Every structure is written in C-alpha cells, then in structure tokens.
Amino acid sequence: MPRRRVVAKREILPDPKFGSQILAKFMNHVMVSGKKSVSERIVYGALDIITERKGLDSLETFEKALDNIRPAVEVKSRRVGGATYQVPVEVRPSRRTALAMRWLVDAARKRGEKSMPARLAGEVMDAAEGKGAAMKKREDVHRMAEANKAFSHFRF
C-alpha cells in the first residue's frame, strides 16, 4: 500500500453548450496537445452532424453510444508459478466510461471520412446502433474474458 495520501478526484466542469460533465470529459479525451478549443469544435461539430443526419437529440445519441461501448469485464495478466494467465476481472464504473471514450476516439481517428467531426459523428452513430470499430473492440474484450473464464479463480 502506498504511504502517500489518496489524491482527491478533481471536479470536471460541465461543457458550456449542453451542461454535460460526460461530454466535457469526452472533449478532454479528444484533445491533443492541450488544444481544448479545437477539441470543442470537433465534438460540437460531430454533434451538429448527428442532429442534421438523424434528426434526433445528439446528446442522447452520444450517451447511448457510450452505454453500448462500455465494457463489463476485461482481462488482466497475472503471473502464477512461471505462467502468465489472462484473468477476467470486472471493470469499475469510472474505468468503463474512460475505456469507452478512449475506444470511441481511437475508432473515429481510424475512419476514412475527410474531417474529424465527420469521423466522430459516424462512429458515434454506428456505436449507438451497436456496430462500428468501437463496438468491435468491446466485443473482442468480452470474448477474451469469456475465453479465459477458467482462470477467474486467480482474481486479484
């Protein structure tokens, strides 16, 4: 156990347009090299594209996409007697959201559309419908956990 004191979680200010803390956190995941205004423009642009194409509430679509991507279990490496086992463990809620956001941004960056807002909008809409690269990543993680269920007694 570390002897230092436990660092308190910093309060994240909600985003200015929608007043959503989750969206503000997502903007921080999109941000590169500390350029927050650029990440805001990308995220708001993506949400505008979603509203334009779907005619639905873009924030609801975004939250539905995040819910679909959130993993329930993941595997962690555990070394036991010279062998390394992939042990399935439950993911705590804060990490679920962080992983979902990371996977969503990574999948959007790998897409083929011209602009980042278009890529992000496409990935969010796909994830809301239960498809896309971010959903595939979640399914792969769940499949790995299912395949290694036999080692779950090596819990941490």
Curated annotation (Swiss-Prot):
Keyword Electron transport assigned: no
One example GO MF annotation: rRNA binding
Keyword Metal-binding: no
GO cellular component: small ribosomal subunit
BP GO terms, sorted: translation
Gene3D superfamilies (UniProt xref): Ribosomal protein S7 domain (1.10.455.10)
CDD domains: uS7_Bacteria (cd14869)
Domain of life assignment: Bacteria
Alphabetic keyword roster: Ribonucleoprotein, Ribosomal protein, RNA-binding, rRNA-binding, tRNA-binding
HAMAP family given in the database record: Ribosomal_uS7_B
Role noted for this protein: One of the primary rRNA binding proteins, it binds directly to 16S rRNA where it nucleates assembly of the head domain of the 30S subunit. Is located at the subunit interface close to the decoding center, probably blocks exit of the E-site tRNA.
Subunit structure: Part of the 30S ribosomal subunit. Contacts proteins S9 and S11.
Family, similarity comment: Belongs to the universal ribosomal protein uS7 family.
Alphabetized PANTHER family for the sequence: RIBOSOMAL PROTEIN S7
Protein's UniProt name: Small ribosomal subunit protein uS7
Annotated source species: Alcanivorax borkumensis (strain ATCC 700651 / DSM 11573 / NCIMB 13689 / SK2)
